[in-house]
């Protein structure tokens, strides 16, 4: 009796693992089948200087961001890119996409509940090894505004 209960438990656990894996794959495929809407924007720095370019694509849930720049941060600093939820009317929430690599590029891909809530991409110059999860707004170096479907 005890052995049959253990066997039933093991088989049920294995079935659940297989089913959850299949469901995750099906969800990922359904998200990829939605059409992507893409835009390219200039990252505008002080005085209207073009700091770099941001390519952004979304289908509402998946977001894919590619950033390029020719600028190099000051010694001991790094450039960090942020997706921001409307600096004036939204929550002001900033999601770090990570630091710009030495090659001057950044690639960010994420599946989100609502990727279109974001309205801006902001670049800041942060201390290397900075432990703060918050952006240093006083050290913002460039920004681009996202067009619809973003900001919804």
Predicted regions and their residues:
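N-terminal targeting/export leaders
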Residues: 2-9, 22-152
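Hydrophobic alpha-helical membrane-insertion segments, chiefly the h-region
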Residues: 13-23
